[in-house]
Amino acid sequence: MKVTKADIVISAVKPEQYPDSDLPEIALAGRSNVGKSSFINKILNRKKLVRISSKPGKTQTLNFFLINEMMHFVDVPGYGYAKVSKSERAAWGKMIETYFTTREQLDAAVLVVDLRHQPTSDDVMMYDFLKHYEIPTIIIATKADKIPKGKWQKHLKVVKETLAVEIGDEIVLFSSETGLGKEEAWKAIHKFTKTKNA
């Protein structure tokens, strides 16, 4: 998809701050510093729309981005960062649970994982959470450029088996460096969104 417009609309922490809109939404989740911001910037053809932080756990709000006036991307705070306090972690959990369980506009989630490593227990927990609430999920296995092409399938198998990926959910090999998987990611997103304008 050609992205001609991408703007941040609001950073929200509670439902009354969510955009008053019927546009479909795609939530983007992933471990702190897994490469989620780089994925968003790459797929939207923007260098710095989402700030890439050297400090994990920096995003503490739900950031809504309006894409081509036709859908919202919702950047969810990264999880699994050890230095976040228990109270912050509890607030984070409540905020995302409220969003995922009450937002009717949510069509699917994108879960970004690092292809180089076996998904963590936090990744498994996040995927299980999404499946518990029957949210269609696209798994973006990023940093594919850091692994020899001949080993991609072996690493993908580990991701699939560790997460116990359900039938119907898609896994896309991705690289924010080379752009590998960009078209496939958009195809998967359009498959789940109510808007079919490619």
UniProtKB/Swiss-Prot annotation:
Keywords: Cell cycle, Cell division, GTP-binding, Magnesium, Metal-binding, Nucleotide-binding, Septation
Example of a GO biological process term: division septum assembly
SUPFAM superfamilies according to UniProt: P-loop containing nucleoside triphosphate hydrolases
One Gene Ontology cellular component annotation held by this UniProt entry: cytosol
Keyword Plastid appears in the UniProt entry: no
All copies of domain EngB-type G, residue ranges: 22-195
Keyword Lipid metabolism: no
Residues the entry annotates as binding GTP: 30-37, 57-61, 75-78, 142-145, 174-176
Entry's Gene Ontology molecular function annotations: GTP binding; metal ion binding
CDD domains, A to Z: YihA_EngB
Pfam family, one: MMR_HSR1
Cofactor: Mg(2+)
InterPro entries hit by this protein: G_ENGB_dom, GTP-bd, GTP-bd_ribosome_bio_YsxC, P-loop_NTPase
Positions with a binding annotation for Mg(2+): 37, 59
NCBIfam families: GTPase_YsxC (TIGR03598)
Similarity-based family: Belongs to the TRAFAC class TrmE-Era-EngA-EngB-Septin-like GTPase superfamily. EngB GTPase family.
Function in brief: Necessary for normal cell division and for the maintenance of normal septation.
Protein name: Probable GTP-binding protein EngB
